[in-house]
Amino acid sequence: MDVNIAPLRAWDDFFPGSDRFARPDFRDISKWNNRVVSNLLYYQTNYLVVAAMMISVVGFLSPFNMILGGIVVVLVFTGFVWAAHNKDILRRLKKQYPTVFVMVVMLASYFLISMFGGVMVFVFGITFPLLLMFIHASLRLRNLKNKLENKIEGIGLKRTPMGIVLDALEQQEENISKFADYISKVNE
């Protein structure tokens, strides 16, 4: 299946007034995780643009360290995803605690980059955009269009780059099973 790029959402949809933002319910981790995954899928192009702008600024100031940091993060992430497919304990960590899994990848990348001396470039060029994405995805309430787009992505009718990354983190399967459960309840 072909990979489609999600449309760039309007600024007033991406960052509306404060009435469309709310603290997540920290007691219900699955609901919070669903909100984050839904927003990551829906606003993925906006997140990519914001991250590209920040990475460009930091990359312009320190190009070698930025390239080095990007290579290290990609290699560490790929290594952890590969290891998670081969080791049950890592697979469970990745599926049950995706945020912890990403934090472990980022910490491992941090320690590798610290050996080369590019820690500040790593923090501001790579980690800070990821943190901003996570904060926005956690706080932004979903709308009906967001939920509909995510159902289309979840049942496999549309493939996007963020959907592929979330598949690697095994976050899509949970949405598909919830959708299948919902359909079976409706049929009963």
From Swiss-Prot:
Sequence intervals crossing the membrane: 36-56, 57-77, 94-114, 115-135
Location of the region described as Targeting to endoplasmic reticulum membrane in the Swiss-Prot/TrEMBL record: 136-188
InterPro entries from the UniProt entry: Prenylated_rab_accept_PRA1 (IPR004895)
GO BP terms, alphabetized: L-glutamate transmembrane transport; negative regulation of L-glutamate import across plasma membrane; negative regulation of transport
Keyword Membrane: yes
GO-annotated cellular components: cytoskeleton; endoplasmic reticulum membrane; membrane; plasma membrane
Subcellular location: Endoplasmic reticulum membrane; Cell membrane; Cytoplasm; Cytoplasm, Cytoskeleton
Family: Belongs to the PRA1 family.
Membrane topology: Multi-pass membrane protein
Function: Regulates intracellular concentrations of taurine and glutamate. Negatively modulates SLC1A1/EAAC1 glutamate transport activity by decreasing its affinity for glutamate in a PKC activity-dependent manner. Plays a role in the retention of SLC1A1/EAAC1 in the endoplasmic reticulum.
Protein name: PRA1 family protein 3
Positions of modified residues (N-acetylmethionine): 1
Domain of life: Eukaryota
Subunit and partners: Homodimer. Heterodimer with ARL6IP1. Forms multimers. Interacts with ARL6. Interacts with prenylated RAB1A and RAB3A. Interacts with SLC1A1/EAAC1. Interacts with RTN2 (via first transmembrane domain). Does not interact with VAMP1, VAMP2 or VAMP3.
Sorted UniProt keywords: Acetylation, Cell membrane, Cytoplasm, Cytoskeleton, Endoplasmic reticulum, Membrane, Transmembrane, Transmembrane helix
Cytoplasmic side: 1-35, 78-93, 136-188
Keyword Acetylation appears in the UniProt entry: yes
Region (Required for homodimer formation and heterodimer formation with ARL6IP1): 103-117
